[in-house]
Amino acid sequence: LTEAERRIAGLVAEGRTNREVAAALFLTEHSVETALTRVYRKLGVTSRAELASHYAAKN
């Protein structure tokens, strides 16, 4: 993952909404959605819950 994708994925894994992530990182919600699509594909996950599980397993 790119640095930006890691930041977005980390905030989503913490339970933040796309709107909250966008506000925290000064991005548009569309940018967050696009990045999450790439993150899901790269990690082979299909949901926010799977993403959170993936991050929990790594830490």
Regions found by a protein language model. Give the residues of each.
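Helix-turn-helix DNA-binding segment
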Residues: 1-37, 41-59
